[in-house]
């Protein structure tokens, strides 16, 4: 009798696993690996879940527990071309980690290369986008000139958007894009450093880099621009014209007067140099603001070192360059 019961149970599990499910278009409906995996569990895991409830879940693979390692490479090194700042063009490929996201053939947002497999950007930049239509371009300088430098283009194999990103407040505005094919490092394509966990950049001068508009309502820049901005404390930002409750500890504010990021800079880097004039760390990601350079409204950035564990957790299949 027990043997018959076991056979019936086994046949039931096989039947459940073979039951057809409604096909889903993951490209259209899902914008993060987390959601993709969750949907797979919901649509294809019913029989597996039933089996695990009876016989126990399998153990986690050992490699899933291993921490993110270090690559044999350096990060944050700029190129030594002549530098012009204050909303003026940069030297060609001075910041070799700066990437632009192109969607359906058009410029969409900025991003930053953090190793040869991943770029980091703002979560709002990839909201409701079809992954198959996103391209990441690195080593570029002038959008209007084809092959003006040693640029490379990559498709995106996966998107990991922070699960708690709030479209109303822009809290947790961070996302990782995995490149379909790794890039090789060169003079024009190199990663930026992530900041140390305890770094407080307030009071420092930051550098914003991107192809954003040079003035509110203006046209997008054709070549990479950079501007230096003072980074404010949390209290200074909450004392600006923004409602104090809008500024969370996960955000940074930077800018003064006309020195500010602008539309089109979203997702791009806010950089500081803490180890010398030519080595940079990514302390912020351009997130939101009111207008461009309006008095009392500094630019608001995602505070990157609040998300170091999140970044490393979602990059366990790769490594980071030595800081």
Please provide the spans of the model-predicted regions.
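Extracellular regions of mammalian proteins, primarily the fibronectin type-III
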Residues: 94-98, 108-120, 132, 152-158, ...
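Protease-domain processing segments flanking chymotrypsin-fold serine proteases, especially trypsin-like
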Residues: 2-115, 119-120, 135, 139-140, ...
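Conserved H-D interstitial segment of serine endopeptidase catalytic domains
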Residues: 77-81, 101-102, 119-122, 127-164, ...
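Conserved, non-catalytic sequence blocks in retroelement Pol enzymes and Pol-derived host proteins
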Residues: 86-92, 164-169, 217-220, 295-298
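Acidic glycine-/aspartate-rich tracts in secreted/extracellular proteins
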Residues: 124-127, 140-144, 180-185, 212-215, ...
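Sequence contexts marking disulfide-bonded cysteines in secreted/extracellular proteins
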Residues: 70-76, 110, 124-126, 236-238, ...
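Chymotrypsin/trypsin-fold serine protease catalytic domain
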Residues: 64-72, 77-79, 144-146, 152-154, ...
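C-terminal subregion of chymotrypsin/trypsin-like serine protease catalytic domains
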Residues: 2-24, 114-119, 123, 226-232, ...
């Amino acid at each position: 009798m027990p043997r018959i019961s076991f056979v019936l149970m086994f046949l039931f599990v096989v039947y459940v696993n073979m039951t057809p499910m409604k096909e889903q278009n993951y490209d259209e409906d899902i914008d993060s690996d987390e959601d993709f995996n969750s949907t797979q569990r919901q649509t294809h895991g019913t029989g597996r879940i039933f089996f695990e409830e009876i016989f126990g879940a399998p153990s986690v693979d050992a490699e899933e527990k291993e921490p993110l390692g270090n690559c044999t490479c350096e990060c944050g090194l700029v190129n030594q071309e002549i530098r012009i700042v204050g909303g003026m063009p940069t030297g060609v490929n001075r910041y070799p980690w700066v990437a632009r996201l192109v969607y359906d053939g058009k410029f969409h947002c900025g991003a930053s290369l953090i190793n040869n497999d991943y770029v980091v950007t703002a979560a709002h930049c990839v909201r409701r986008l079809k992954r198959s239509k996103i391209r990441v371009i690195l080593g570029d300088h002038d959008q209007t000139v084809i092959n003006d430098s040693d640029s490379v283009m990559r498709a995106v194999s996966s998107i990991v958007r922070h699960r708690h990103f709030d479209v109303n407040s822009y809290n947790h505005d961070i996302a990782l894009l995995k490149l379909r094919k790794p890039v090789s490092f060169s003079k024009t394509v190199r990663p930026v450093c992530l900041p140390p966990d305890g770094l407080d950049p307030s009071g420092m001068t930051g550098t914003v880099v991107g192809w954003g508009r040079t003035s509110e309502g203006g046209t997008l820049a054709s070549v990479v621009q950079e501007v230096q901005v003072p980074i404010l404390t949390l209290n200074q930002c909450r004392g600006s014209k923004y409602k104090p409750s809008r500024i969370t500890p996960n955000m940074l504010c930077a800018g003064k007067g006309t020195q500010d990021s602008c539309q089109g800079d979203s997702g791009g880097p806010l950089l500081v140099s803490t180890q010398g004039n030519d080595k940079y760390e990514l302390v912020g990601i351009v997130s939101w603001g009111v207008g461009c350079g309006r008095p009392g409204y500094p630019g608001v950035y995602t505070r990157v070192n609040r998300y170091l564990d999140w970044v490393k957790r979602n990059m366990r299949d790769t490594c980071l360059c030595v800081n």
